[in-house]
């Protein structure tokens, strides 16, 4: 990907996101996280040079590899994938800006225990399965507030920053919107 194409594509995405944001509220702040799952280091560097600063990976090993390959760039790295318990220590050592996929109280307790042992803190979002889809991880909406409170009370090494939810996988806009009510 060349810089001109990257810049044009990024500008188009920013324009669409900004338009959607303004239709909802001019007071909301939106950050675009470029998911680099299928991108090589050259493409990520090109997008960085075009203005994209935050990138997300869905596998701990891929996050580590890309962070190492691109360490000269001050990229804001996010973890967006399902976190397996056997990968927690590796993720903690990478210290991503934000973990988007804290999908259960059990995972939060295990993550907190390992953070405490390393004397570290980590920012995270509670993942809510608002579409009630079996293929998606996350807590169900009706227990989300209670689990959020439990994590706040019992996991001092996790800095909860909010929730993350993915709408229904559908072409039906009404069904997608229902996922976020």
Can you annotate each of these PLM segments?
Residues 1-181:
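Conserved alpha/beta-domain cores
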